[in-house]
Amino acid sequence: GAVADSVLVQHAQGCSLLPVAQAQSEPAAFCLDVNLRWSADQVRAAPAPDIALPGGLDLRTLQAGLVAAQLAGALMEVFQRTLQYANDRQQFGRPIGKFQAIQHQLAVMSEHVFAARMAARLGCAGQGIFPERLRVAVAKARCSQAALAVAEAAHAIHGAMGFTEEYDLQLLTRRLHAWRQTAGSESYWHGVAGAALVHGHAGSTLDLIRSTTDITADITA
């Protein structure tokens, strides 16, 4: 409630614009978030904005595409900070980034970060301004999956310093954990992609992968 006066909440009956001042707040220390709760009467009395999205697109899909882009940016920042720390931190007379074990962890981080970056770009690709649901599923699933691995490796390399309040790494990794769950975790979006393959596609798995990941037609259209 320090920034927003109202929040748009999606529930079983649709969407409601709910004032933050009327909510019961519960601080969530792990992610530096606040959990907001409203009564059923408050939800029924709140205005329901008329949000019309094209092509059957729902708010969760739109939100997931945006959060995937946020995750990709945060993942890159965590990786760059960790790489810089590994080059600066001296142990046994040389930077810890010279040790093979640290180099291996950095290499794995890099794979996750750049895979998430490409997936997030795929989630934003399309012929219009609104994302395609299956591409968003790929983007959010891959970025959420990377969040766990990158946060774990970053804190392993930083050691205890990464958890301190004075060091900004924990601000970024808290966001990774929070955004991983926002609009559906990787498990949810894996299910969306699987359902598209089983129920909504007549060709082979490879055909679906090609049609989903090939953005050249969108660029030339």
Predicted regions and their residues:
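FAD-binding core of flavoproteins
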Residues: G1-Q80, L206-T212, T216-A221
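Alpha-helical interface subdomain recognition
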Residues: T61-A221
